[in-house]
Amino acid sequence: MFRKLLKMWILLRPTHWLILIALCAVTCAGYWLLWSEIRLEHAFKPLSKLGDSLSPDQHASSTTDDFDFEEHLVVLYNRVPKTGSTSFVNIAYDLCKPNKFHVLHINVTANMHVLSLPNQIQFVRNVSRWHEMKPALYHGHMAFLDFSKFQIAHKPIYINLVRKPLDRLVSYYYFLRFGDNYRPNLVRKKAGNKITFDECVVQKQPDCDPKNMWLQIPFFCGHAAECWEPGSSWALDQAKRNLVNEYFLVGVTEQMYEFVDLLERSLPRIFHGFREHYHNSNKSHLRVTSSKLPPSESTIKSIQKTKIWQMENDLYDFALAQFEFNKKKLMQPDNKHVQKFMYEKIRPK
């Protein structure tokens, strides 16, 4: 038997040998491809598990085609004290149920305006991932926090209000002594102190120190240490940059209705009905400081000579100019029709 097989191998022609070698090569290649596919399948299994474990925010960063802007809308109002913020926020509380959005107050320990590093991380995670609360309006007395530092795919929309710095300081001075009509029975920290603001300035007491005006600049500047150094030129420049680049809209207390109007036109998912409610309800001047006396001319001139007032007023004027610009661009040049835009010359047809 062996001799017959050997004889057959010897009698094979060269073409037969080539065919046999080719068949062997194809068979080996097939086995190698099958083995490689099995290895790849095992290698990709952990990756598929990793994909399944990705958070909603991580999925959102990889694909934004299915992102619903309206239903994921988050507005962050880091309200400066004594700028009329209570009046605005209470409209939100009145309309959150019919408009189907949530309002959340950010209450920081001891009324601190800057968050610790662990709390920054936790706050950013809460705002970004708390989908049950969206759409939402968060509000609280805290400095601007840059969400882009935390690799967040969809940052909240910042809004705020500013007020003439001396008016804000005078209002806060009397608020600490006499409170307001919002909670008239609450005893304030300086209750019983009857010294007027004018007298305080003459006596150079700490409660009317111009350094107390240094608040709107750091609120827009943010969480950097330099932001909270009274008189810092860097802080003022940073506050202006953030106001233009990071805030959707900054209004002024003296034009609250126009601020509400622009928000309702721009973000109706949350602010629908705010204009009418502000105009017709008693919420337009909800919190009025009691027993407030206007400062004298001499006091005003004295305060306006200080560097702090000049810098805070610089920011106020800057914000006012930007707000007036946004109001103006709402209308067409004839000032009678709302500005519109359209798409045209779309190719290919």
Curated annotation (Swiss-Prot):
Residues 1-17 are cytoplasmic. One of its GO terms (cellular component) is Golgi membrane. Residues 39-349 are lumenal. Gene3D superfamilies: P-loop containing nucleotide triphosphate hydrolases. Its main location: Golgi. One of its GO terms (molecular function) is heparan sulfate 2-sulfotransferase activity. Pfam families: Sulfotransfer_2 (PF03567). Belongs to the sulfotransferase 3 family. Homotrimer. This is Heparin sulfate O-sulfotransferase. The lineage of its organism: Eukaryota, Metazoa, Ecdysozoa, Arthropoda, Hexapoda.
